[in-house]
Amino acid sequence: MVSRRISEIPISKTMELDAKAKALIKKGEDVINLTAGEPDFPTPEPVVEEAVRFLQKGEVKYTDPRGIYELREGIAKRIGERYKKDISPDQVVVTNGAKQALFNAFMALLDPGDEVIVFSPVWVSYIPQIILAGGTVNVVETFMSKNFQPSLEEVEGLLVGKTKAVLINSPNNPTGVVYRREFLEGLVRLAKKRNFYIISDEVYDSLVYTDEFTSILDVSEGFDRIVYINGFSKSHSMTGWRVGYLISSEKVATAVSKIQSHTTSCINTVAQYAALKALEVDNSYMVQTFKERKNFVVERLKKMGVKFVEPEGAFYLFFKVRGDDVKFCERLLEEKKVALVPGSAFLKPGFVRLSFATSIERLTEALDRIEDFLNSR
């Protein structure tokens, strides 16, 4: 028998639906899969070429569990310059995607029963990871009427002696909203006053369509109470390469490195050198293309009378539906061959998530089918 804690953890709903859509496509069905949490662009050619070059050298060996020094140094330099922070490579740990960076952070910080505050709608893997690490979860709901912006007052009201961290995700998955500077400033002050960590997942920070984006690093003085999470999957279309990273105090980074040394040993060596090259690659063409797609989907859904908050980042649009969102997605896939993710997967029933990480041509066809489906209900 498998352990109780694993039995109680659901499979990732987004991964499950993505696999279901791909299975139908493999059978020859004309399914438009808008569940994907990954860019549809190929990995930039210079990155692929660097991986090939490194493979041909034949030096594919274990690396430091924290990641190769050159990559940690490059990340520290880039993030340090962007946010005017003095960051040492020893504060950086390279991980198997940002997802492992998050899991390692929870494992490093949480004792049994420690609480993490999260905001709903919430990405599908946060809560299972916290539970697997022995923590408990307190969910703060956000609302479309308030543009899915979190409330500092609600956070303060929920703080208890076992609160170890507050987890934020901006730009947000699934809503696409960007958290306001005033909230982040207040959260930093509160963390210092009440002695908790802020874990900030900013994996979509390179895909922003507003001038108002604020990172937690813009408003924090240092890394004593901060764990910053990012990666290369979304910024450089490297989802399958599995390279993410964590930046925090040296104390937290050392703890995370210890975990990694006993789990994965290190990150794929070839992927690390590919990521090092990616630091030199401009991704502005991706941002512009996603912005055009976002604008297209927004205008089309407005004409359809659909209610939503316009995304400011990432590549998702989270819109309201009538009735059961799970049945909505099941019927849409069955009748119109369009795959979306129900809001219930993000603890927000009554909504669905659409990914616009595909071509305008396919988005046009998908929205035509969705409109037909809505009109037939």
Swiss-Prot record:
* Entry keyword NAD: no
Q: What is its EC number?
A: 2.6.1.1
Q: Which reaction does it catalyse?
A: L-aspartate + 2-oxoglutarate = oxaloacetate + L-glutamate
Organism in which the protein naturally occurs: Thermotoga maritima (strain ATCC 43589 / DSM 3109 / JCM 10099 / NBRC 100826 / MSB8)
Q: What is this protein called?
A: Aspartate aminotransferase
Q: Name one GO molecular function term.
A: L-aspartate:2-oxoglutarate aminotransferase activity
What keywords are annotated for this sequence in UniProt? Aminotransferase, Cytoplasm, Pyridoxal phosphate, Transferase
- Name the domain of life this protein comes from: Bacteria
Annotated positions binding L-aspartate: G37, W123, N173, R353
- State the InterPro entries in the record: Aminotransferase_I/II_large (IPR004839), AspAT/PAT-like (IPR050596), NHTrfase_class1_PyrdxlP-BS (IPR004838), PyrdxlP-dep_Trfase (IPR015424), PyrdxlP-dep_Trfase_major (IPR015421), PyrdxlP-dep_Trfase_small (IPR015422)
User: Could you tell me where this protein is found in the cell?
Assistant: Cytoplasm
Which residues are annotated as modified residue N6-(pyridoxal phosphate)lysine in the UniProt record? K234
Q: Which GO terms describe its cellular component?
A: cytoplasm
